[in-house]
Amino acid sequence: MIDNVRIFFGFDTKYQKDVKADLQQLKKDDKEIGEMIIELEKSKNVHSITRTKRGKSNSSGFDREKAKKDIPQGSIINYDPDVKTDINGNHRTPRIGLSHELQHSSDVDKGIMSYENIGNGIPMREIRAINTENKIRKRTGDAKRTEYRGRKIPQKLLE
């Protein structure tokens, strides 16, 4: 997922080393997340991780029209391992954000990206990603995430 520069130049950049370290730690943090990462690494679809542009937050890029039709595809994760805050400015261990985006990549890889919203407008795909990140939050000691863009996630949907 992160080796294109090494293949071209013959060495890893600091960014690549940091991302690889975060991926390895995620594999150790949670067995299910580790299996998800291995599935993405072995996928016939191409998934890559690139540095988030300055001033932007972590994100996953993919073809939304294909996703709405449940067509499996690759993705591009935008991730900055040096950003230690979430979108609201609260402290967050960086790999928590990576786990969230990896869940989106896994969903599009399998063709199961949900565009269904729950009653208060939160997309189910975000609840899935938040449940994934909460597994890592438990390991890092970061507070459990219970909201999405200021809206409370119903407790029954949180793992």
What spans do the regions from the language model cover?
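Catalytic toxin/effector domains delivered as secreted proteins or via bacterial secretion systems
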Residues: 2-159
